[in-house]
Amino acid sequence: MQDYAFRRLREEPLLLALLTYWEGKRGDREVPDRRDIDPTEMPPSLLPHLCLIEICEGNRLKVRLVGTEIVRQHRRDNTGKFADEYLKGEYLAYLTALYLDLRARRLPVLAESRFRHIDTQLETTRLLVPLTMGGADVRLVLMGQVFRYRSGQANAPIAQPLDAGLLEVLNQIPLDRVKRAATPPPPPSSEADAPS
């Protein structure tokens, strides 16, 4: 599954740019902090596809920021709202489990799902990366999201909110390969290894 996930990321340059940026910001740490993130350092084409979610008390998800492409595709701006204020049922349960799993693992997650509506079908790929908020606990998730319509359909938002359709979860893959030790490599063990 890891090979598949990284192949999908190579096929989605915006999501790969987010992962590369996140890895650069974390350095030797397991997870970067929110204060390390500066949108002006990101590719401008990525910004409309970003969403910042806070995991609050009681495991409620609060939308802190939503990019314009996500607003356009979802047909609403949920900035400042809790997910349970505008989502219900299966979709809310899916998203909550996705974010809580990321928090527990402290790893990026690639998630793919499909929404089926009467007149259209849409697939979406999300890359979720964890962030701390001034402490050790993962409290924020920075998500990049891209949308793909079935062949022959316009890349325009559907006539109703995404969650009004039937949800099909395709993949949810923690990216274990990006986890690395926080300790630097040992120095050369002998004089033969040292540069002359």
Regions found by a protein language model. Give the residues of each.
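Intrinsically disordered, low-complexity regulatory segments
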Residues: 160-196
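Sensory/regulatory domains in signal-transduction proteins
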Residues: 2-165, 196
